Amino acid sequence: MAEITAALVKELRERTGEGMMDCKKALTKAGGDIEKAIDDMRASGAIKAAKKAGNVAAEGAIAIKDDGKAAVIIEVNSQTDFLALQDDFKAFVAASVEKAFADKLTDVAPLIEAQEAARLVLVGKVGENVNIRRLKRIEGDVVGTYLHGNKIGVVVTLKGGDVELAKDIAMHVAASNPEFLFPSEVSAEAIEREKNVFLQLNEDKIKGKPAEIVEKMVGGRITKFLAEASLVEQAFVKNPEVKVGDLAKKAGAEIVSFTYFKVGDGIEKPVDNFADEVAAQLAAAKQ
């Protein structure tokens, strides 16, 4: 059994919104397996869904540069949100994305190297660490982008259609954050997990019902799950009566890909314990 650490409990709490003790109990019951703990909590009716894995705590900004045929999206991290709003930081981010686009970079390493001198100057000036974290270049027949503030950036590529359509779909992706483009991309394992959760959650409702009825109920849940998880099956945010895939098809377009960046995805930022900090300061003062 995996050790039930405070970090593991914290992650489960962030993903489910449940209390610390409930999360610890669920993890203990699941033998330290966080995914099983989430499934068990969903099956018991404690939660309806869980956030995607990944602690989101780092600050910074997302930046995009595009010309309708190609785009570069980057993430630059800072230690505080205050710095991310300052002109010096914004100028560094803007210069970095311009450099990445102009040089047609496809990997973050050359950008980090090229911007290192400017980064050191910025760090020396603001007294806070700054890092270029990631970069992706996307090319296609039609490329549209959407930036939500400076925290979420999306790039969508189409075959056919126009840039405005790609931008509309990119805005939808920013709002809904789908996991997949097509239902066919959802793994059999994920579908099986969803099926098992549904059966456990509705155990009383399906008890005694004919197998074919249960099968229809499960099928309905899986259809809904696939619609929620895949972009082409989602209801378009600007017109919920139309699916995103149908929107593209009506315009004579095909969605080829989407890229979603959110500041801090997958980064765990240490959280200072105020009580411990005060205790440490008092101890130091006595020395």
From Swiss-Prot:
Task: Give the location in the cell.
Answer: Cytoplasm
Per its UniProt entry, which superkingdom is the organism in? Bacteria
Name the UniProt key words of this record, in alphabetical order: Cytoplasm, Elongation factor, Protein biosynthesis
One annotated GO molecular function is: translation elongation factor activity
Residue numbers spanned by region Involved in Mg(2+) ion dislocation from EF-Tu: 80-83
Where does the UniProt entry say this protein principally localizes?
Answer: cytoplasm
Gene Ontology cellular-component annotations: cytoplasm
Q: Which PANTHER family match?
A: ELONGATION FACTOR TS, ELONGATION FACTOR TS, MITOCHONDRIAL
Q: What is the documented function of this protein?
A: Associates with the EF-Tu.GDP complex and induces the exchange of GDP to GTP. It remains bound to the aminoacyl-tRNA.EF-Tu.GTP complex up to the GTP hydrolysis stage on the ribosome.
The record's similarity note reads: Belongs to the EF-Ts family.
* Name by which UniProt lists this protein: Elongation factor Ts
**What organism, scientifically named, is this protein from?**
Pseudomonas syringae pv. syringae (strain B728a)
GN (gene name): tsf
